[in-house]
From Swiss-Prot:
Homodimer. It comes from Blochmanniella floridana. GO terms for molecular function: FMN binding; pyridoxamine phosphate oxidase activity. Belongs to the pyridoxamine 5'-phosphate oxidase family. It is an enzyme of class 1 (oxidoreductase). Coiled coil: none annotated. Pfam families: PNP_phzG_C, PNPOx_N. The gene is pdxH. This is Pyridoxine/pyridoxamine 5'-phosphate oxidase. One of its GO terms (biological process) is pyridoxine biosynthetic process.
Length: 214
């Protein structure tokens, strides 16, 4: 077991390739695509991102969700319409995302507002999922209290039997969200804590870039 007295000594030097302005792209999503591919080649779950939302009192909440689609303008994730995150988004669509690729000394932070994609788009993605995953979506009322894991498993097995030779119906509560991106910050660890940070901010459809002090 790690002794609490030793936690303050947990540190390492971040040794990375140079990250300069000349490495940047005009559209931050092009750099995002490059970094995502490099993360994919080196770490598990590179599409896992920490989504931050706030409730009606201003209390922030965070959780990992999976990036499922992106293009030159946006990124997309999916969830239950009745989940805690979706309820927060319904009240306040402003969110923040973080891709925590600390294993390769990188991090990307994204801010913006989200809006629902069409039912047709959500349905298209839903049916790319493995059938057992489709069934588990029906079995779980996300974020609600359950008495035990057994209750959830029994419901799943009952539904699995029901849809053994049938298609799983599309859940009316399954929703996808697109992000209208306002800013993207690319961070790369540097030796002696001289990290590199570049912030893209959008103003009237144009991206402006600034280097930030670490």
């Amino acid at each position: 077991m790690l002794e609490l007295s030793k936690i303050h000594n947990l540190r390492r030097e971040y040794i990375s390739k140079q990250f300069r302005r000349s490495n940047l792209t005009k559209n931050p999503m092009h750099l995002f695509s490059k970094w995502l591919y490099e993360a994919y080649c080196q770490i598990p779950d590179p599409n896992a991102m920490c989504l931050s939302t706030v409730d009606h009192t201003g209390q922030p909440f965070q959780r990992l969700v999976l990036l499922k689609y992106f293009n030159d303008k946006t990124i997309v994730f999916f969830t239950h319409l009745n989940s805690r995150k979706a309820i927060h988004i319904n009240n306040n669509p402003k969110i923040s995302l973080c891709f925590p690729w600390n294993i390769i000394n990188r991090q990307i932070i994204i801010t913006g507002s989200v809006y629902k994609i069409s039912k047709k788009e959500a349905q298209k993605y839903f049916y790319t999922r493995p059938k057992n995953n489709q069934i588990s979506t029906w079995a779980s009322k996300q974020s609600t209290i359950i008495s035990s894991k057994k209750v959830l498993k029994n419901k799943f097995l009952k539904l699995k039997k029901k849809y053994f030779q049938k298609s799983v119906p599309f859940p009316h509560f399954w929703v996808g969200y697109k992000i209208n991106i306002n800013s993207m910050e690319f961070w790369q660890g540097g030796i002696y804590r001289l990290h590199d940070r570049f912030l893209y901010k959008k103003n009237k459809k144009k991206w402006y870039i600034n280097r930030l002090s670490p």
